[in-house]
Amino acid sequence: MPKERRSRRRPQPIIRWVSLTLTLLALCRPIQTWRCSLSLGNQQWMTAYNQEAKFSISIDQILEAHNQSPFCAKSPRYTLDSVNGYPKIYWPPPQGRRRFGARAMVTYDCEPRCPYVGADRFDCPHWDNASQADQGSFYVNHQILFLHLKQCHGIFTLTWEIWGYDPLITFSLHKIPDPPQPDFPQLNSDWVPSVRSWALLLNQTARAFPDCAICWEPSPPWAPEILVYNKTISSSGPGLALPDAQIFWVNSSSFNTTQGWHHPSQRLLFNVSQGNALLLPPISLVNLSTASSAPPTRVRRSPVAALTLGLALSVGLTGINVAVSALSHQRLTSLIHVLEQDQQRLITAINQTHYNLLNVASVVAQNRRGLDWLYIRLGFQSLCPTINEPCCFLRIQNDSIILRGDLQPLSQRVSTDWQWPWNWDLGLTAWVRETIHSVLSLFLLALFLLFLAPCLIKCLTSRLLKLLRQAPHFPEISLTPKPDSDYQALLPSAPEIYSHLSPVKPDYINLRPCP
């Protein structure tokens, strides 16, 4: 007899239901949506004369973006404030972090290698070959600063570094992953102004960050002035940088407006009492959701509520497990019933085959006896020795009796270990036990829903209300630029020097300030 095989069904994975319930409860937490804004202000500019005006990006995501950028895969990293005599862009570590016992400036020499005016042309991949003629220092073309930002998140400030030079920089902000090769502009045909206007700067940044809101701080002073001496430097090669510059704050009395704005209409280069001033805005990327959110407050919950929630969760998980077990048992019972019907048909077919084999064997035996008697009557031996065959009749083996004995009822072969929570009989019939199981399962499930339904309704309602409150609403305003007569534009003795610094008229239509 072959050994009886038992098929065991594992208990329902309660961990799966726990994870599902915790996922539903996690929906009560508000999802953080990142909205970045480009704001213009003067928070990062230094007021001292002849000093280095640095900028910082105080966020760890920038360092991660640098490490993941394809342009910085093999770039060296420096720990000095200057390399080859020129200051580099640096990312100071977060507050409180120290390296080797002292606070260190971590600098990176990534593409491009000269993100400021003043670098040597052989070190600058953006140097224009068309500017090899004898030109003044104001003919320096624009530089492109690539910042590989993974995502707009956190609060950080972005301006540029100034160390005795006028920072005529055109920004090109990109989010990683970047293309394999940077798309450098072709400057062989037309002159590209170093700084068109703040409107062009906003437009370029808007294209680089399509998923970020653009706004600015409507509070004076709007931008600092950069003092430029009215002189040029001639050389046999291309101009390397503007002359030495000084940085100071905008004179609020000179640039006072009723709206708190200072809008250069046609030019960014003005003539003030101290000399020629170039107006450039500092830039900052601010996360609106983080900046506008209130500081987190700790909510104390009573132990009774925690116990009630834990008890409700336990009862609910038990009810779900019992309900699933009852449904599984019902399906297994139906499957066993169908298989037993098929088994009964198979047993009937085996019995019929057994009877047919018995009849065939009886007929074969009768035929052999008749042939043997006939051959002996004629004076021969029996049939097989006469035809010289040791076995001239078919020997029929009938094993259907053994096979039929192995076919036990399927309900007796299947183990019922999966019914471990309800492994009781009480002398009841099967349908009564199934009814009790189903009623208890439905009762526990209803009890679980009664405990959890108020929490789910409250959480979903609060979530929808919060999403409605956080919907961005920007009032439309129209800013009219001040006429050119309000500012004395610089008219140098050599107009060709400043010809490429005359920006186009910026677009003031449909500008949206921060809420």
Curated annotation (Swiss-Prot):
Q: Which Cys residues form disulphide pairs?
A: C212-C215, C212-C392, C384-C391
Give the location of motif CXXC in residue numbers.
212-215
PTM comment for this protein?
Specific enzymatic cleavages in vivo yield mature proteins. Envelope glycoproteins are synthesized as an inactive precursor that is N-glycosylated and processed likely by host cell furin or by a furin-like protease in the Golgi to yield the mature SU and TM proteins. The cleavage site between SU and TM requires the minimal sequence [KR]-X-[KR]-R. The CXXC motif is highly conserved across a broad range of retroviral envelope proteins. It is thought to participate in the formation of a labile disulfide bond possibly with the CX6CC motif present in the transmembrane protein. Isomerization of the intersubunit disulfide bond to an SU intrachain disulfide bond is thought to occur upon receptor recognition in order to allow membrane fusion.
Could you tell me which residues belong to the region Fusion peptide?
Answer: 304-324
Signal peptide stretch: 1-33
Q: What Gene3D superfamilies does the annotation carry?
A: 1.10.287.210
Cytoplasmic side, ranges? 457-515
Query: What InterPro entries does this protein's entry cite?
Result: TLV/ENV_coat_polyprotein
Which segments does the entry list as coiled coil?
A: 330-376, 388-420
**Residues spanning the membrane:** 436-456
Q: Where is this motif: CX6CC?
A: 384-392
Write down the position(s) of the site called Cleavage: R301, S302
Q: Does the keyword Signal apply?
A: yes
The lipid modification S-palmitoyl cysteine is placed on: C455
Sugar attachment sites are N129, N203, N230, N251, N256, N271, N287, N351, N398
The annotated region (Immunosuppression) lies at: 365-381
Q: Name one GO cellular component term.
A: host cell plasma membrane
Q: Which domain of life is it from?
A: Viruses
Spell out the subunit comment. The mature envelope protein (Env) consists of a trimer of SU-TM heterodimers attached by a labile interchain disulfide bond.
Q: Know anything about its domains from the record?
A: The 17 amino acids long immunosuppressive region is present in many retroviral envelope proteins. Synthetic peptides derived from this relatively conserved sequence inhibit immune function in vitro and in vivo.
Q: What this chain does, per the record?
A: The surface protein (SU) attaches the virus to the host cell by binding to its receptor. This interaction triggers the refolding of the transmembrane protein (TM) and is thought to activate its fusogenic potential by unmasking its fusion peptide. Fusion occurs at the host cell plasma membrane. The transmembrane protein (TM) acts as a class I viral fusion protein. Under the current model, the protein has at least 3 conformational states: pre-fusion native state, pre-hairpin intermediate state, and post-fusion hairpin state. During viral and target cell membrane fusion, the coiled coil regions (heptad repeats) assume a trimer-of-hairpins structure, positioning the fusion peptide in close proximity to the C-terminal region of the ectodomain. The formation of this structure appears to drive apposition and subsequent fusion of viral and target cell membranes.
Give the protein's recorded name. Answer: Envelope glycoprotein
Please tell me the species this chain comes from: Bovine leukemia virus (isolate Japanese BLV-1)
Lineage of the organism: Viruses, Riboviria, Pararnavirae, Artverviricota, Revtraviricetes
